[in-house]
């Protein structure tokens, strides 16, 4: 840490969920290694995700999510965003950052608006295949846009967009070194189920119901790790106990990358961070996009991996316990297919995304344009 602040300060702004904070954490790790003093601006939800940042480098900015059309609620929301703008200006006057990078979520609006109005270079990173609402609102103001799954060379902001991939945290890169080893037909079958950093109620009900429909000899092979919301944890655990299936059920796993590396098969939502980690580590998956995502971003993320042959995608509405049981039984008895899926997933992973994004961040901080960056990085 001795070289911190040799280069100056960069502030990362991210909404307080794992999907926004994990790529911010990955970029922070890379920038620190290059001598930057990295601070995080976020909201109050972020507490359990920010262990990678020193406490005095985490700044809670007042914010609110724009939802609905109630005039009173909208007035309160815009008042909170205005207060966040004042918070951000005060913070930036003290830190004097050379760059502010946004990772999506409404809590990024105040810091990015404040930075652009103060003449501080700005960059946003969009993790998904479809740009989220906060980033859409910022895209016209920022100096550069980095994309995880955004379509290349298309859209209104193609000229200032660079496809970097989604940065993954160091533990993911460590897990990626573990090769995929398929389970033999009589071996224990390690199943990992998770719904992103906030869990998934649907999985807590559907997976135990599907496991109950499996033949007894198939159930006896299962070892399950399942992330469940706190309110669903006890019922999911009890369901597996009743079935006699060993299951580790918890609201959050700090060692999720290692658990993914240990898995023979993954059933998950298809948020950008989830899909990116699956591809970097290289594991076969069934993806069930969250059906109520505002911009259908999860469906687009899942389609990108399915097109490469790295995952099966199933709509939640089509996934009855019976169908889920059939698909799980098929996965358990087709190790060669899962091995091919794992290879296909890994082939589209971008383990160097943090390095590429850090290169872009340093270029924008130094005053370069996106065009100059692209020309300097052509092979």
Curated annotation (Swiss-Prot):
Protein family per UniProt: Belongs to the glycosyltransferase 28 family. MurG subfamily.
Keyword Cell division carried by entry: yes
Pathway info: Cell wall biogenesis; peptidoglycan biosynthesis
Source organism of the structure: Brucella canis (strain ATCC 23365 / NCTC 10854 / RM-666)
Upper lineage: Bacteria, Pseudomonadati, Pseudomonadota, Alphaproteobacteria, Hyphomicrobiales
Residues that hold UDP-N-acetyl-alpha-D-glucosamine according to the record: 17-19, 128, 169, 197, 298
Gene3D superfamilies xrefs: Glycogen Phosphorylase B
Signal peptide segment: none
EC assignment: 2.4.1.227
UniProt enzyme class: transferase
Listed name of the protein: UDP-N-acetylglucosamine--N-acetylmuramyl-(pentapeptide) pyrophosphoryl-undecaprenol N-acetylglucosamine transferase
Function of the molecule: Cell wall formation. Catalyzes the transfer of a GlcNAc subunit on undecaprenyl-pyrophosphoryl-MurNAc-pentapeptide (lipid intermediate I) to form undecaprenyl-pyrophosphoryl-MurNAc-(pentapeptide)GlcNAc (lipid intermediate II).
């Amino acid at each position: 840490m001795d070289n911190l602040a040799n280069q100056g300060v960069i502030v990362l702004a991210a909404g307080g969920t794992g999907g926004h904070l994990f790529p911010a954490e990955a970029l922070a790790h890379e920038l620190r290694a290059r001598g930057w003093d990295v601070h995080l601006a976020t909201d109050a939800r972020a507490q359990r995700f920010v262990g990678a940042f020193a406490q005095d480098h985490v700044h809670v900015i007042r914010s609110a999510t724009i939802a609905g059309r109630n005039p009173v609620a909208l007035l309160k929301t815009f008042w909170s965003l205005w207060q966040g703008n004042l918070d951000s200006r005060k913070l930036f006057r003290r830190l004097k950052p050379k760059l502010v990078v946004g990772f999506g979520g409404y809590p990024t609006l105040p810091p990015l608006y404040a930075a652009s109005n103060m003449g501080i270079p700005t960059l946003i990173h969009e993790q998904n295949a479809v740009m989220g609402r906060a980033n859409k609102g910022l895209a016209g103001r920022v100096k550069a846009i980095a994309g995880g799954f955004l379509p290349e060379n298309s859209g209104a902001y193609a000229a200032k967009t660079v496809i970097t991939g989604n940065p993954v945290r160091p533990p993911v890169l460590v897990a990626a070194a573990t090769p995929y080893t398929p389970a033999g037909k009589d071996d224990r079958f390690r199943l990992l189920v998770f719904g992103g950093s906030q869990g998934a109620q649907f999985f807590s009900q559907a997976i135990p119901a599907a496991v109950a429909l499996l033949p007894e000899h198939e159930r006896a092979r299962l070892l399950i790790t399942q992330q469940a919301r706190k309110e669903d944890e006890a019922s999911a655990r009890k369901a597996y106990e009743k079935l006699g299936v060993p299951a580790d059920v918890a609201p959050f796993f700090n060692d999720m990358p290692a658990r993914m590396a240990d898995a023979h098969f993954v059933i998950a939502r298809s948020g950008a961070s989830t899909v990116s980690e699956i591809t970097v580590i290289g594991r076969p998956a069934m993806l069930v996009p969250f059906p109520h995502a505002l911009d259908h971003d999860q469906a687009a993320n899942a389609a990108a991996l399915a097109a490469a042959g790295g995952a099966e995608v199933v709509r939640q509405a089509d996934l009855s316990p019976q169908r889920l049981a059939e698909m799980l039984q098929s996965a358990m008895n087709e190790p060669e297919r899962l091995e091919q899926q794992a290879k296909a997933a890994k082939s589209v992973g971008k383990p160097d995304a943090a390095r590429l994004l850090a290169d872009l961040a340093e270029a924008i901080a130094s005053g370069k344009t996106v065009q100059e960056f692209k020309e300097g990085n052509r092979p």
